[in-house]
Amino acid sequence: MARRPLLEFEKPLIELEQQIEQIRQLARDSEVDVSQQLLQLETLAARRREEIFQNLTPAQKIQVARHPHRPSTLDFIQMFCDDWVELHGDRRGSDDQALVGGLGRIGDRSVVLLGHQKGRDTKENVARNFGMATPGGYRKALRLMEHADRFGLPIFAFIDTPGAYAGLLAEEQGQGEAIAVNLREMFRLRVPIIATVIGEGGSGGALGIGVADRLLMFEHSVYTVASPEACASILWRDAAKAPEAAAALRITGKDLLSLGVVDEVLAEPSGGNNWAPLEAGATLREALERNLSELLALPPQELRDQRYRKFRAMGRFIDQASSDADSAS
């Protein structure tokens, strides 16, 4: 079995991974019983991996969120969705491959699913534009969401993008307008919307499909107004300060849950979703079904009212001096 690519902070695991692979090769090439040694090494590696991932910095979480083997939108759809039919095109001459969507069934309920889609290698990433959607992608997403609204189908959105594509052609085609229209129209939809940040959630590109009744987020995903690299370049004129920017931006699930931006943080397997994709898929499915059950109990107008109030409550300023004074009293 090929060894999974390890991130920079996982280097303490390299020697263990090499030993495990050598023992596996020995077991394949001979009749020697190495099950006990293999179990001991795998247990030790799992324990060390858990120790590492319990103390990740925001900058390290970004590396996990960008891992090339992290489950994508289509991966999750294939894990727990039956009768999946992808729908194409925005009916204006575009079929953006960076944002996919379609119809499917989860259990006995039909739903509309859509999300950003990255590639596994350079060729796929070029075809998918590295998960950066164009105006056509956001218009395709809106077409599918309007279809869901017309037929009373819940919407599941999966966010995984460094941001909307910022090329000249995208701007000429109305990138800002396409995202703005999505924001406006998503507030008007009468069906439940659940969005999940499965990897990166970058800027307006993420928000373009992120106006939801419930916003979920995986433990090692990130959700930010700008990438730390861009933030560091703007504030300090030095992209090398990205780790400091990542900490200041408060992009982790724990931070965003405390700020009221996300509603639930989903636990990941030890080592991140890329180590146990099926376990991650089961976690996501359970969370989607549970939250959907709660939202289906609400009438459409109440759904829209709660959605509006949820986003209006974001962005409140906290004066630290006043907060300290209140605590003292």
Swiss-Prot record:
Where is this protein localized, as stated in its record?
Answer: Cytoplasm
| Keyword line | ATP-binding, Cytoplasm, Fatty acid biosynthesis, Fatty acid metabolism, Lipid biosynthesis, Lipid metabolism, Nucleotide-binding, Transferase
PROSITE patterns registered for this protein in UniProt: COA_CT_CTER
Can you cite a GO biological process for this protein? fatty acid biosynthetic process
Pathway, according to UniProt?
Lipid metabolism; malonyl-CoA biosynthesis; malonyl-CoA from acetyl-CoA: step 1/1
Q: Supply the enzyme class, top level.
A: transferase
**What is the E.C. number?**
2.1.3.15
Q: Name one GO cellular component term.
A: acetyl-CoA carboxylase complex
NCBIfam families assigned: accA, AccA_sub, PRK05724.1
UniProt lists the family membership as follows: Belongs to the AccA family.
What does the annotation say about its assembly with partners? Acetyl-CoA carboxylase is a heterohexamer composed of biotin carboxyl carrier protein (AccB), biotin carboxylase (AccC) and two subunits each of ACCase subunit alpha (AccA) and ACCase subunit beta (AccD).
Name of the protein in question: Acetyl-coenzyme A carboxylase carboxyl transferase subunit alpha
Q: Which organism is it from?
A: Synechococcus sp. (strain CC9311)
> Which gene carries the instructions for this protein?
accA
